[in-house]
From Swiss-Prot:
Domain notes: The protein kinase domain is predicted to be catalytically inactive.
Alphabetized SMART domains for the sequence: CYCc
Annotated source species: Mus musculus (Mouse)
Name of the protein in question: Guanylate cyclase D
Domain Protein kinase as annotated: residue spans: 541-812
């Protein structure tokens, strides 16, 4: 039989790879003639030849069996990408493996084998395939996907295997990751440095392998300091290409577009679509150069090779004129194999098929791996795949398209060629060559044909100089002198303009009707606080008397004093016959009247509104600086609300609130947020008109860089949560939140957040750090529902959800149906209401208080023992109490977990409420105390808090029998066919009882008796009352006829083996008890009960069970 034959044909640069065929020689039938029978002697000769052939074949098989095999794996997306599959990895690897195995100088005594490992096109699946074959192969060729190069390198290092990949970057100096080609990023940088193009864009296909390639390429470019204008990927179809073209249009100064996708020359549809779109959008007119990335990974055929996609004289042929193709150089004489060499000199019947040029890249990687393995074995490392990168230095062997050469550091050296078209033909023409040993680009004599006749403009050379700082393509050192001169001239001109403007502004500040600076000659300071009536005095004469230092002249409400001494104790003065208020700055702070501060003061001066206090000027006196504001004699809104002698009805409140909203609306229309709005800086004048004050104070301090005093926690109760968390700058939405807090104050006449009962620090912390949201509580009877809803809308957590002041103003006016409120009429109505009988009101409040007191005491006595409740009411300490003899009852529901899982939460709550209401009714007929219920657990004690001698065991035993009897007939409403199996545990002994906690205090029991009773319940069985020996002794001492059966030794957690008993009845107890299950040791009774519960629920869900009321008797268990 003929052996397997191989072959490969090369036709110039248009090379093809073979199909494999098994060629069997034609064997005709044996034809025996008389001549054969007569030649007897020939039989012996044939026999000798036959046995000799057999012995020779056997020796060859033994020799092959004795050779050690090194298996390598070829990773790649061979199964999911048709263009990658055209590389024929099986044939390429087989050719290389056969060449190695046939070379006697390579791997003597060993042989090379391979496995092709399809990885899929996505990174997770590729990494999983890589990990799955760690024990099958000794080294890897790949990966092709750079997305998992780093992970694969780390894993391979741990496994002691090497990776030979043309897609992965690796540090110099060998190791387990060996690049089989020079860095693609370095090749592109060398080409672009030669042409002087620095501004890049990278467009990739949507496939994972190409997206990752684009990202790593962009990272490499940014590492070299190059500007990357765009990194994007193509969406599906022509729409995605159109979107990318629009993005390329928008990038300023772009020169190069790297295309990370399959080349259009090899059938890449994405690149074909993108180039067609670029041609339609006019991007192929010479302004851009498109550069395919995938051709850097193989030797693309050129010369006499024609490409059909460029032979149609269509848009793609014209668009490809703007494409420069960089590919490995390919020389016909450099091919490692010819058809004769690969077939071993034998004739082969092969059918040619066009394949991807990546075929040769795979072949070279296997050859490089084989030579590294040969050197490793020569140096005594054995046939191991570890650290093969240390053995590829200074290598020079025959490759597929050119010789495989490496330098002294193991870096691959190769030659690249730049290919171009003229926009009319279908062939690629070499124009430049790049040798990676020198990284120099040399022209080959034929110039590049650029669309439009000229290449894109050069970028600044500083982009490619690692020792030069390049800012937007300009070398700063070249224009430093010009910039310095321009800056000096600009500074001189600016200083001159500044001083001239400052002088003019100083004149305006002190003269004219719009002056801002006020002096001591214009203010009169009084000894006493002014009355609500406006005094009429001659401000000019009064000012002169103060300045002259003589005896003060008599005025209406007081006398003037010497200015320096009196200013420390007053904030009120007279200015042009009107009372004014001085908002003083901190001691030692002298406002710096710089232009920004003066502009701010003029803005304040121009604000005039009846609901905003007027800013009259800035007073600077000896040791005192203050803002002069309009004075309102009735004080702040906070003072007004705290005045209990003043009754405020809704009309009065609405009038104040409407004034507040109008004033704040005016500030917001002037683009002036308040930032510190609170009821303390809302003042009321003599006509009960509310005005907003204190606006601009903090901003003025900030405008001339003066320190802003740190507010106390009580001052921050009106501040919005986003301002508490952030820098605290004034915002319009922050004022809306403050308005909502003032609304709460006015409606309730209480301080902010008073209903929480917390300190200011705690409230601020809760407001600033939700959830939960912390907001004031306002009952519906404290104001109109519409006003409360508006208030709640204003304090929304998200600032964008709060309404604007225009919306608030419109909504608030609608609350009063647009009517104007009169404060005088409101005060008259309040006086009429105040004349009503207070005695009836006091009597009504007294009766309500007594009723609430009785309710509270009754509720407290249900939650705690009466003695404990009384002590808590009196405020005395509840001391823990020791009880020497008590009996504790624990019970739970068997299968409760399964019941809960099969029921809705509301059904579980209803079922437990029905069951425990039934149990609570049983408690009334026994001397017991219910301690607590937690989930399905029910805890009762007797002998505490009221001692009952030796009756505690009997009371609990009687209770347990009653509960067991009632539980046997109990049925759930939503699953009436499911029986409720209760198990109980009893134990007697001493314990300690006391109250734990101040918030929601609980009466708790402590001691080993509690734990033992719980263990008795947890080790019991359904429809059983598990009793400890101490309880049995107490019951037998009473001699009341309790029926007790011995259970035997029971393992109790923390106790070991103890003798326990079943309480099965009592003489004279006539109620029926449910029949316990027949349970043997080791019997999985829990599974049986859970299955029964599931069956019952299934019936209930299907409507097979008859509906019953909860607690109604049903069929016995």
């Amino acid at each position: 039989m003929a052996g397997l034959q191989q072959g490969c044909h090369f036709e110039g640069q248009n090379w093809t790879a073979p199909h494999w065929k098994t060629c069997l020689p034609c064997q005709g039938p044996w034809r025996l003639t008389v001549s054969h029978l007569k030649t007897v002697s020939s039989i012996s000769v044939l026999s000798v030849v036959f046995w000799s052939v057999l012995l020779w074949a056997d020796s060859l098989s033994l020799l092959a069996w004795a050779r050690e095999t090194f298996t390598l794996g070829v990773l790649g997306p061979w199964d999911c990408d048709p263009i990658f599959a055209q590389a024929l990895p099986s044939i390429a690897t087989q050719l290389a493996v056969d060449q190695v195995n046939q070379d006697a100088s390579l791997l003597p005594g060993s042989q090379l084998d391979f496995k092709v490992l399809p990885t899929g096109c996505d990174t997770p699946h590729a990494l999983a395939t890589f990990v799955a074959h760690k024990n099958i192969v000794a080294a890897f060729v790949g990966p092709v996907n750079p997305g998992f190069c780093s992970a694969a390198a780390l894993l391979a290092q741990g496994w002691g295997k090497s990776l030979f990949s043309w897609a992965c970057e690796a540090p110099e100096g060998g190791g387990d990751l060996v690049p089989t080609l020079p860095s693609a990023a370095d090749v592109l940088l060398s080409v672009m440095r030669h042409f002087g193009w620095a501004r890049w864009a990278i467009v990739s296909s949507h496939q994972d392998i190409w997206v990752t390639t684009a990202q790593q390429l962009a990272t490499a470019f940014r590492t070299h300091g190059l500007p990357i204008g765009l990194v994007t990927s193509l969406g599906p179809g022509e729409k995605g290409a159109t979107e990318v073209c629009k993005q390329l249009h928008s990038v300023h100064g772009l020169k190069i577009v790297v295309l990370c996708m399959h080349s259009a020359l090899l059938g890449g549809l994405e690149q074909t679509t993108l180039l067609h779109c670029a041609w339609e959008e006019g991007l192929t007119d010479g302004r851009l150069v498109f550069l395919p990335y995938d051709t850097l990974l193989f030797a693309l055929p050129y010369g006499n090779r024609s490409y059909l996609v460029l032979d149609d004289h269509g848009p793609l042929q014209e668009a490809y004129d703007a494409v420069l193709t960089v590919s490995l150089e390919s020389s016909p004489e450099s091919h490692a194999f010819t058809a004769t060499e690969m077939s071993g000199g034998a004739t082969a019947n092969l059918e040619p098929e066009q394949v991807s040029p990546l075929f040769g890249t795979i072949y070279d990687a296997v050859i490089l791996l084989a030579h590294a393995l040969n050197r490793s074995e020569t140096h005594g490392a054995g046939l191991s795949g570890a650290h093969l990168g240390d053995h590829v230095r200074a290598l020079d062997v025959a490759g597929f398209s050119q010789r495989i050469r490496t330098d002294g550091k193991g870096r691959r050296l190769a030659q690249y060629v730049i290919l171009d078209t003229d926009g009319e033909g279908s062939q690629l023409v070499p124009t430049h060559i790049l040798d990676t040993s020198t990284w120099q680009v040399q022209p080959l004599g034929k110039p590049i044909h650029f669309p439009g006749g000229s290449p894109p403009a050069h970028d600044a050379s500083c982009w490619f100089d690692p020792n030069t700082l390049c800012i937007r393509g300009v070398q700063p050192l070249g224009s430093l002198l010009t910039l310095t001169i321009a800056c000096v001239l600009a500074l001189v001109g600016g200083f001159l303009a500044y001083f001239i403007r400052l002088g003019l502004q100083q004149l305006r500040l002190l003269r004219g009707p719009h002056r801002i600076l006020l002096t001591s000659q214009e203010l009169t300071f009084l000894q006493r606080t002014p009355s609500r009536r406006r005094p009429h005095v001659d401000s000019g004469s009064e000012s002169r008397s103060v300045v002259d230092g003589g005896s003060p002249r008599s005025v209406t409400q007081g006398s003037a004093r010497s200015l320096p001494a009196f200013l420390e104790h007053t904030n009120v003065a007279l200015y042009q016959g009107e009372w004014v208020w001085l908002k003083k700055f901190e001691a030692g702070v002298a406002p710096d009247l710089r232009p920004s501060s003066l502009s701010f003061l003029r803005k304040l001066r121009e604000m005039r509104h009846e609901n905003v206090t007027a800013f009259l000027g800035l007073f600077v006196g000896p040791g005192v600086s203050a803002m002069v504001l309009e004075h309102c004699a009735r004080g702040s809104l906070e003072d007004l609300l705290q005045n209990e002698n003043l009754r405020l009805d809704w009309t009065f409140k609405a009038s104040l609130l409407l004034d507040l909203i109008r004033g704040l609306r005016y500030l917001h229309h002037r683009r002036f947020p308040h930032g510190r709005l609170k009821s303390r800086n809302c003042v009321v004048d003599t006509r009960f008109v509310l005005k907003i004050t204190d606006h601009g104070y903090a901003e003025f301090l900030e405008s001339h860089c003066s320190s802003r005093p740190q507010p106390a926690p009580e001052e921050l109760l009106w501040t919005a949560p986003e301002l508490l968390r952030g820098p605290g700058k004034a915002t319009f939405k922050g004022d809306v939140f403050s308005l909502a807090i003032i609304l709460q104050e006015v409606l309730t006449r209480d301080p902010p957040y008073c209903s929480w009962g917390l300190s200011a620090e705690e409230i601020i912390r809760k407001v600033a750090s939700p959830p939960p949201l912390c907001r004031p509580l306002v009952s519906p009877d404290q104001g109109p529902l519409e006003c409360i809803q508006l208030m709640q809308l204003c304090w929304e957590e998200a600032p964008d959800d709060r309404p604007s002041l225009d919306q608030i103003y419109t909504q608030f006016k609608s609350i009063n149906q647009g009517k104007k409120t009169s404060v005088v009429d409101s005060m008259l109505r309040m006086l009429e209401k105040y004349s009503e009988s207070l005695e009836d009101l006091v009597q009504e409040r007294t009766e309500e208080l007594e009723l609430e007191r009785r309710k509270t005491e009754r509720l407290l006595s249900q939650m705690l023992p009466p003695s404990v409740a009384h002590a808590l009411k009196m405020g005395t300490t509840v001391e823990p109490e020791y009880f020497d003899q008590v009996t504790i009852y624990f019970s739970d529901i068997v299968g409760f977990t399964t019941i809960s899982a099969l029921s809705e939460p509301i059904e579980v709550v209803g079922f437990l409420n029905d069951l425990y209401t039934l149990f609570d009714a049983v408690l009334d007929s026994h001397d017991v105390y219910k301690v607590e219920t937690i989930g399905d657990a029910y805890m009762v004690a007797s002998g505490l808090p009221r001692r009952n001698g030796n009756r505690h065991a009997a009371e609990i035993a009687n209770l347990a029998l009653d509960i067991l009897s009632y539980a046997g007939n109990f049925r759930m409403r939503h699953a009436p066919d499911v029986p409720i199996r209760v198990r109980a545990g009893l134990h007697s002994g001493p314990c300690v009882a006391g109250v734990v906690g101040l918030t929601m205090p609980r009466y708790c029991l402590f001691g080993d008796t509690v734990n033992t009773a719980s263990r008795m319940e947890s080790t019991g069985l359904p429809y059983r009352i598990h009793v400890s020996q101490s309880t049995v002794q107490a019951l037998l001492s009473l001699d009341e006829g309790y029926k007790i059966d011995v259970r035997g030794q029971t393992e109790l957690k923390g106790k070991g083996l103890e003798e326990t008993y079943w309480l099965t009845g009592k003489v004279g107890f006539c109620r029926p008890l449910p029949t316990p299950l027949s349970i043997k040791p080791g019997d999985p009774w829990q599974d049986r009960i859970n299955q029964e519960i599931r069956t019952g629920f299934a019936k209930a869900r299907q409507g097979l069970a008859e509906p019953r009321k909860s607690g109604e008797a049903g069929p016995g268990p």
